[in-house]
């Protein structure tokens, strides 16, 4: 049972719809996607009936065809709405904008359909999916199987809803729902590992063994990229730089380009302020001088602020706690496959600091291998691309006729 599943009322097992098993260990070892330049990915002609992989996160939604090395399109997970009165009738209609097009229009009401990795507004989520599938990929969804990623801690009803949307709204011929952490493991060509994922809305550590999550050892921290951006914006305001809502992209740009993780926070903090200062030129021509803010921002991932009633721990301690909760016979294998994933793990210095602190928290004899792929912000999507393109996976799709016979509960039989 995975960490997402609660105790749903499931229909009795049906012998005619067995849950296929995959021997992925040997398959994934041989399955590597071509490492082509990103510009080439979008230039491919889309297959007429190829599977489409959809990974919707708090910050961005990634979409592309199975078998490709990277998602073809990445769009901000934002929908902007404004009433518009048509010329032919008096009834106002709602005009919508997706992604950056919405963020750049201050007159719009913005909706973020995903909070802390979980879809909370299905209408807005469907608008984004339709836009990316029909407008960006230019495909007819009735011709393409759809693979959706599903985050840890999502309610089981969300998986049922994904099945309904895929078949009822998008008219897909087949679909599948896959665990995000399991897909991240597949992206590394493995079936077991400790996934350390810090993205835009949430951070979690999930042990995965032989393609299955270990829910009892999963850790969660409700602090990630969006919180770092807000913290940096607060420090920029304190330095005298006026910021509006439309400047959040500027703050994000500063965070990604200039912020770094200090090897030793106390030593870095003790450096003279002048040694740390950098003068940055912003896209609009303004300049801002920053110093210790550049490493104080991502430090939150290692020393999160206390919350009333809670004492959250940093990401390395979360990983150590996950390892301590798994069976001793699994610990060595997982410790040698610690997989950094998510865009907030891309800071310069993150991997080295994480490994140093994790080793400090483990017994001296522990052997730890931390892997950090350059494309780890796409790990979930890449894992989905690999899985959906495997020949042995094709019997695992939830088919339309199975949905029509069994309803959305079919997801518990055929999907992880």
From Swiss-Prot:
Keyword Cytoplasm in annotation: yes
Cellular component GO terms held in the UniProt record: acrosomal vesicle; actin cytoskeleton; perinuclear theca; sperm head
Cell compartment(s), UniProt: Cytoplasmic vesicle, Secretory vesicle, Acrosome; Cytoplasm, Cytoskeleton, Perinuclear theca
InterPro entries named in the record: Actin (IPR004000), ATPase_NBD (IPR043129)
Alphabetized UniProt keyword annotations: Cytoplasm, Cytoplasmic vesicle, Cytoskeleton, Fertilization
Region annotation Disordered: where it falls in the sequence: 1-23
Record-linked SMART domains: ACTIN
Any one Pfam family match given in the protein's UniProt record, by short name: Actin
Subunit-structure text: Interacts with ACTL7A.
Family to which this protein belongs: Belongs to the actin family.
Function per UniProt: Testis-specic protein that plays an important role in fusion of proacrosomal vesicles and perinuclear theca formation.
Entry protein name: Actin-like protein 9
Native species: Bos taurus
């Amino acid at each position: 049972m995975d960490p997402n599943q609660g105790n749903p009322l499931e229909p009795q097992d049906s012998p005619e719809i067995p849950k296929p098993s995959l021997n992925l260990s040997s398959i994934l070892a041989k399955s590597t996607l071509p490492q082509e330049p990103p510009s080439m990915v979008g230039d491919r002609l889309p297959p007429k009936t190829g599977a489409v992989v959809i990974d919707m996160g708090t910050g961005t939604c990634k979409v592309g065809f199975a078998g490709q090395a990277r998602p073809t399109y990445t769009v901000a997970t934002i929908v902007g709405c404004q009433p518009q009165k048509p010329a032919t009738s008096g009834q106002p209609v709602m005009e919508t904008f997706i992604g950056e097009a919405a963020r750049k229009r201050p007159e719009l009401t913005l909706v973020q359909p995903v909070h802390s990795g979980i879809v909370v507004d299905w209408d807005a989520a469907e608008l984004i999916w339709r836009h990316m599938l029909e407008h960006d990929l230019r495909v007819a969804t009735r011709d393409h199987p759809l693979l959706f990623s599903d985050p840890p801690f999502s309610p089981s009803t969300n998986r049922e809803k994904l099945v309904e949307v895929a078949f009822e709204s998008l008219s897909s011929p087949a679909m599948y729902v896959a665990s995000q952490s399991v897909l991240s493991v597949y992206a590394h060509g493995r079936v077991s590992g400790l996934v350390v994922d810090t993205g835009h809305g949430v951070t979690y550590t999930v042990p995965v063994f032989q393609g299955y999550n270990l829910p009892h050892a999963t850790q969660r921290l409700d602090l990630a990229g969006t919180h770092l951006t807000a913290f940096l914006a607060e420090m920029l305001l304190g330095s005298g730089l006026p910021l509006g809502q439309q400047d959040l992209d500027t703050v994000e740009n500063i965070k990604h380009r200039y912020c770094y993780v200090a090897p030793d926070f106390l030593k870095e903090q003790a450096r003279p302020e002048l040694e740390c200062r950098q003068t940055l030129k912003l896209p609009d021509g303004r300049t801002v001088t920053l110093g210790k803010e550049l490493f104080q921002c991502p430090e939150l991932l290692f020393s999160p602020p206390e919350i009333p009633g809670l004492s959250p721990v940093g990401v390395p301690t979360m990983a150590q706690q996950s390892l301590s909760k798994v069976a001793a016979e699994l610990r060595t294998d997982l410790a040698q496959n610690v997989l950094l994933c998510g865009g907030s793990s891309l800071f310069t210095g993150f991997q080295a600091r994480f490994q140093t602190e994790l080793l400090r928290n483990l017994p001296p004899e522990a052997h730890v291998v931390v892997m950090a792929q350059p494309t780890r912000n796409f790990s979930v999507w890449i894992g989905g691309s690999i899985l959906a393109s495997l020949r042995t996976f094709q019997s695992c799709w939830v088919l339309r006729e199975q949905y029509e016979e069994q309803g959305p509960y079919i997801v518990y039989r055929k999907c992880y």
